[in-house]
Amino acid sequence: MRTHYCGNLNKSLAGQTVELCGWVNRRRDLGGLIFIDMRDREGIVQVVVDPDMKDVFEVASQLRNEFCIKFTGEVRVRPDSQVNKDMATGEVELLATGLEIINRSAALPLDFNQTNSEEQRLKYRYIDLRRPEMSDRIKLRARASSFVRRFLDENLFLDIETPVLTKATPEGARDYLVPSRVHKGSFYALPQSPQLFKQLLMMSGFDRYYQIVKCFRDEDLRADRQPEFTQIDIETSFMTSQEVRNVTERLVHDMWKELLDVELGQFPVMPFSEAMRRFGSDKPDLRNPLELVDVADLVKDVDFKVFSGPANDEKGRVAVIRVSGGASLSRKQIDEYGNFVGIYGAKGLAWMKVNDRAAGFEGVQSPVAKFLNEEVINAILERTQAETGDIILFGADKAGIVSEAMGALRLKLGTDLELTDTSAWAPLWVVDFPMFEEDGEGNLHAMHHPFTSPLGVSAEELQANPAAANSDAYDMVINGYEVGGGSVRIHNAEMQTAVFGILGIEAQEQQEKFGFLLEALKYGTPPHAGLAFGLDRLAMLLCGTENIRDVIAFPKTTAAACLLTDAPSLANPASLEELAIAVKLAEKKDA
């Protein structure tokens, strides 16, 4: 039906007759001529309809926004005075010789000239996606997927599919369950990742695997999460963690260069402990210059229990953030930041303004200064390298609360005070994660997943002191977003059984849930390691947006609903009966 895309017309086509298909972006009647801005996925071109072409002119006079149309015409170069430098096709226009209305459009439920609500945009997503901004994002995502396949194919990785209907395994979130009609009362689970199948592929001898795959997690959503999401899943045999990092870093480096013409450089590597100490996060945004500084040793002997208590608690932490020029913050602003850290469990936010650094103790202003002697204050000023005009903000509590609260405050200050360089790219690797983390009841949980190999310890050593072990795991972080995570996997049954035991999974449960894996580990399993990227998050960063819904064609809401199709919906009673399922809804309690 067409010979060219609207957005691809240029001066090299001058004098040629072309056929275009697309939509009316805008219609203007000027000086007896009709001008149509015609749009397709590649862009917009101006079409001129001359009244001398009576039949065409008559049809063109009926056009309204979003009519689906076909134009035939001659490409001609615009006079210099009429060149539109704001359009990629601004040097040319199409002189129409034929026009067909393929389909008319009703009045649009969205107005492209104003901001529409998120609900309306999702309900009429097929219209929202016509906007050039949205179309460009989906196209860039497609280019990213194509690049990944090409890169991995060239590096001898095999694209292998794994099952979607599989067995529920504990991977940190709730599973989406699918009832079996044949095996009544039994359920499949949609995969949270292809983790075990890709490990089994390594045991099968396919030493370089990849897959761009849908995964599913029934968890509470936020801006960078969806119930169904897309992973770039990678697994290798006979490669160390360093070698896996090298090839996947090169993938991202080359992707940014090809798609954005951005040179990322070599990614720095940072241990988990350093990331938490300096930034209060295992996915630090290195574009932000603010850092956490520990001062527990300086305040452990003061009479102020708010500081000395955590300073003398082995599970406590006292850390500060020095904000250059922050002494200009008002008391109201400081109180608002105090309320902000309260969201993360902090009991308050002590502060100290440095009005005159040269005056030392006499030059600071703080409600807690009276509890601190001159020696302590001078030591804090020295350690933080504070200068006149700065403010020092204090966090003192359990280490986890301080790290999370002050880490979040660091990000907020970076945004509010425009300290974060939003034009920069700051990738890094975070490595040497703890093997396990403790919940509030003292139970250990795998920080990544239970198939991650510990770093440099035997099964016996791990069992003797599991809380001290680190894992051979690694996360790729870009601008404060974890875009990929992976690890070396356990490749012998003894270590895997030991890890299950530490996690409180008894022998019988191990066999019920993971018997197939433990059996497979008996038969010459190679050492293997891998990584999975979140394609949605990568695309989000590439497109310069902050919400993965912007780079997914048909996303869900934060309530995991599809406003376009009204999913999820009630099932047909006959279907439920066939599956031997009865739905019992919780009764609403009277107020």
Swiss-Prot record:
Signal peptide: none annotated. Its EC number is 6.1.1.12. Pfam families: GAD, tRNA-synt_2, tRNA_anti-codon. L-aspartate binds at E171, R217, H448, R489. It comes from the Bacteria. It is an enzyme of class 6 (ligase). GO terms for molecular function: aspartate-tRNA ligase activity; ATP binding; nucleic acid binding. The keyword Transferase does not apply. Keywords: Aminoacyl-tRNA synthetase, ATP-binding, Cytoplasm, Ligase, Nucleotide-binding, Protein biosynthesis. It is found in: Cytoplasm. SUPFAM superfamilies: Class II aaRS and biotin synthetases, GAD domain-like, Nucleic acid-binding proteins. GO terms for biological process: aspartyl-tRNA aminoacylation. It catalyses: tRNA(Asp) + L-aspartate + ATP = L-aspartyl-tRNA(Asp) + AMP + diphosphate. GO terms for cellular component: cytoplasm. ATP binds at R217, D218, E219, Q226, E482, G534, L535, D536, R537. Residues 195-198 are annotated as: Aspartate. Its main location: cytoplasm. Catalyzes the attachment of L-aspartate to tRNA(Asp) in a two-step reaction: L-aspartate is first activated by ATP to form Asp-AMP and then transferred to the acceptor end of tRNA(Asp). Homodimer. Belongs to the class-II aminoacyl-tRNA synthetase family. Type 1 subfamily. HAMAP family: Asp_tRNA_synth_type1. This is Aspartate--tRNA ligase. It comes from Aliivibrio fischeri (strain MJ11) (Vibrio fischeri).
